[in-house]
Swiss-Prot record:
Membrane topology value: Single-pass type II membrane protein
Subcellular location per the Swiss-Prot or TrEMBL entry: Golgi apparatus, cis-Golgi network membrane
EC numbers on record: 2.4.2.58
Gene Ontology molecular functions: hydroxyproline O-arabinosyltransferase activity
Disruption phenotype: No visible phenotype, but reduced level of arabinosylation of EXT3. Short-root-hair phenotype. Hpat1 hpat3 double mutants have an impaired growth of pollen tubes, thereby causing a transmisson defect through the male gametophyte. Hpat1 hpat2 hpat3 triple mutants fail to produce detectable levels of Hyp-arabinosides, have low fertility and shorter pollen tubes.
A Pfam family it matches: HPAT
Record's function text: Glycosyltransferase involved in the O-arabinosylation of several proteins including extensins and small signaling peptides. Catalyzes the transfer of the initial L-arabinose to the hydroxyl group of Hyp residues. Contributes redundantly with HPAT1 and HPAT2 to arabinosylation of EXT3, but main contributor to arabinosylation of CLE peptides.
Name of the protein: Hydroxyproline O-arabinosyltransferase 3
Catalyzed reaction equations: trans-4-hydroxy-L-prolyl-[protein] + UDP-beta-L-arabinofuranose = O-(beta-L-arabinofuranosyl)-trans-4-hydroxy-L-prolyl-[protein] + UDP + H(+)
GO cellular component: endosome; Golgi apparatus; Golgi trans cisterna; membrane; trans-Golgi network
Superkingdom of source: Eukaryota
Listed InterPro entries: HPAT-like, HPAT/SRGT1-like
Species whose genome carries this gene: Arabidopsis thaliana (Mouse-ear cress)
Top enzyme category: transferase
């Protein structure tokens, strides 16, 4: 377990070569984490997760908060809210948050450079993402890790639509990264597909954690090894019609999970890492609000998911520009998680300068 086979190197390398030789060369240069032709591993030995991992204390080491983004208005307003709440929670007791970087993979600077710490990287070559813009995420991290100066030894991979609802400690324990488990990431269900990228000789499919790359707190050292493989696997999967059809919009999440398993990296699964309204009803004991789902309710406070509600908050309603300041609060009976989310968005938009014009 943890040793990438020569067969895997051939399959991934050849698939990626078909896509773009230059990018493959760069990834190999950045230690893609597969074996040499003689079978010798380019990976660190696998460290088994200790039995007493649940009793271990969180690492006090600070972590760098990093998220990838485009220069689209939809991404910009989310990043501004996210950065606002990062600043509010960073200095509070219980927080291990260090620096912050918006990794901008548009290839050019934008008008948020002076507001949010930003590192500009190149997008994938035209057409390579095949309309699936999320494929730029692993490539962005590869470039950032290679070129940026990162003081912290740990990194939190976050997203623009994350809001820090409580101070976030370093949840990584004993060198093991921490991740949020997603119910829809089910490697065992797709074993016949997963085996194309994680062959049987590498270990059971259960070695692949039910996660994506975000939210994840991981050591910089581990991420430097995983990121090129994550990109390699994701691009190869996108170019395989069977895999692309099976995984759809979560393909890149499977890419990260499989790449981690290739490197023998297991994650501590933390359900308290994140909540997702409207399905999660309370923010108590949680750290991040992920507002990926629309919140639709009638005026009785009843959820009308799948149908536009009399009251709603859905980030997709604001694709071309930011939501207005002072949005109306949900009606009585709506879960605390949704109420808190709207209040936090309202506070951020009321405080951030030039909210409506930037």
């Amino acid at each position: 377990m943890g040793k990438a086979s020569g067969l895997l190197l051939f399959l991934l390398g050849f698939g990626f070569f078909v896509v773009t030789y230059n990018l493959l060369t760069l990834i190999v240069h950045n230690r893609s984490g597969v074996s040499n032709s003689d079978g010798s591993p380019l990976l660190d030995p696998v460290v088994q997760m200790p039995l007493n991992i649940r009793k271990a204390k969180s690492s006090p080491a600070p972590f760098h908060v990093a998220l990838t983004a485009t220069d689209a208005p939809y991404n910009k307003w989310q990043c501004r809210i996210m950065y606002y709440w990062y600043k509010q929670k960073k200095a509070l007791p219980g927080s291990d948050m260090g620096g912050f970087t918006r990794i901008l993979h548009s290839g050019n600077s934008d008008n948020l450079m002076d507001e949010i710490p930003t590192f500009v990287v190149d997008p994938l070559p035209p057409g390579l993402d095949r309309g699936y813009v999320v494929l730029n995420r692993p490539w962005a991290f590869v470039q950032w890790l290679e070129r940026a100066t990162i003081k912290e030894d740990y990194v939190l991979m976050a997203e623009p639509d994350h809001v820090f609802v409580n101070p976030l400690p370093n949840l990584a324990v004993g060198g093991f990264p921490a991740a949020f488990p997603f119910f829809y990431i089910t490697p065992e269900k797709y074993e016949n597909i997963v085996r194309k990228y994680y062959p049987a000789e590498m270990g059971p499919v259960t070695n692949i954690d039910p996660i994506g790359n975000s939210p994840v707190i991981i050591s910089k050292e581990s991420l430097e090894k995983i990121a090129p493989t994550w990109m390699n696997v994701s691009l190869t999967m996108k170019n395989d019609p069977e895999t692309d059809k099976a995984f759809g919009w979560v393909l890149e999440m499977y890419g990260y999970a499989i790449a981690s398993a290739i490197h023998g990296v297991r994650h501590i699964l933390r359900k308290d890492f994140m909540l997702q309204p409207p399905w999660d009803l309370s923010t108590k004991g949680k750290f991040i609000i992920h507002y990926t789902y629309g919140c639709d309710y009638n005026m009785k406070g009843e959820l009308t998911y799948g149908k536009i509600g009399e009251w709603r908050f859905d980030k997709r309603s604001h694709l071309r520009g930011p939501p207005p300041r002072n949005m109306s609060l949900p009606p009585p009976g709506v879960p605390e998680s949704v109420v808190t989310l709207v209040k936090m968005v309202n506070e951020a938009t009321a405080t951030i300068p030039n909210w409506d014009t930037l």
